[in-house]
Amino acid sequence: MFDKLQSIKDKFQTIEQQLSDPEVVADQNRFRKLNKEYSSLKEIVRAYDEWSRTKKQLDEAHSMQKNENDPEMRALVEEEAGELQERLPKLEQQLKILLLPKDEADSRNAIIEIRAGTGGDEAGLFAADLMRMYQRYAERQGWSCQTLEVSEGSVPGSLKEVSLEVSGHNVYGILKFESGVHRVQRVPETETQGRIHTSAASVAVLPEAEEVDVEIRKEDLLIDTFRSGGKGGQNVNKVETAVRITHVPSGIVVACQEERSQLQNRERAMKMLRSKLYDLQIAEQQKSRADLRRSMVTTGDRSAKIRTYNFPQSRVTDHRIGFTSHALPQIMQGELDPLIEALRMHDQAERLQAETA
């Protein structure tokens, strides 16, 4: 492991020198590529440097222990050595995690699709609650969150389904564990007997695809236009600005009516289609790895119930990792960091175990 770390540090230093070369700076494509690689190695090199300093200090402390005759000084050195000895394995564990293979999709933006499931009107209201939860979390993270498509439910404030585009730093890598069935237990406002109802909504988080990721042939597309029910001023229900695209080979259908022009809706619909096809490719690749790692967190099995929101007890439980929190109101306001961090740590532990198996 340490030979690999030294090799990474050597490469990091070489890139650092190249980035100050005027010829490299003048070549913007090369400069961007090197700068991206530099950024990806920076955290590993910093952690390796910290480990190296700690190891050197520990070796020096051991040497002083052997040569120190003064009892008081010897006691101080032993105390320092004990602290360093305790710290070193933690730094080594951090390095192992940083060396784990990166999912190239983690750095991408994401599309979140939320659909009401079983439970009637209450499921539609819960889908709207989840949408607001993710919107608020995105706001806390400093991300951009835009609505791509929305279908309202039968009661005010409810949703049949909604698609959100979330843009920012490492969005997909942070949100990918949210894919799955989310269950809610609460007393509906219309319930006169005070009985708790159970309903559900499904969440799918897709990495946003770029045009180079997926080849889409024009002859494989059926494009329909229809009158928009969304914003658009005087054009609403008069001009066919909404767009529906069907990808014939896969059967995937996407639609967008949120923008004011047909061209804008078509561009957004194509973005959604590319992401769905890219997600399909990734899912096929992951099938071959399923026997190696069956963690529901990392495979994103959307058919499984991943989380329960129990409103009467103010409790959220993530069933994949046994995480429980009694801060349900805060979580519904977008305070998801403790939950997401627990999922990421579990994923890291699973991957470390797979690497050493």
Swiss-Prot record:
It comes from Chlorobaculum tepidum (strain ATCC 49652 / DSM 12025 / NBRC 103806 / TLS). Belongs to the prokaryotic/mitochondrial release factor family. It holds the Pfam family PCRF. GO terms for cellular component: cytoplasm. The keyword Iron-sulfur does not apply. Methylated by PrmC. Methylation increases the termination efficiency of RF1. Peptide chain release factor 1 directs the termination of translation in response to the peptide chain termination codons UAG and UAA. PROSITE patterns: RF_PROK_I. NCBIfam families: prfA, PRK00591.1. This is Peptide chain release factor 1. Keywords: Cytoplasm, Methylation, Protein biosynthesis. GO terms for molecular function: translation release factor activity, codon specific. It is found in: Cytoplasm. SMART domains: PCRF (SM00937). InterPro entries: PCRF (IPR005139), Pep_chain_release_fac_I (IPR000352), Pep_chain_release_fac_I_sf (IPR045853), Prokaryotic/Mito_RF (IPR050057), RF-1 (IPR004373). The modification N5-methylglutamine is found at Q234.
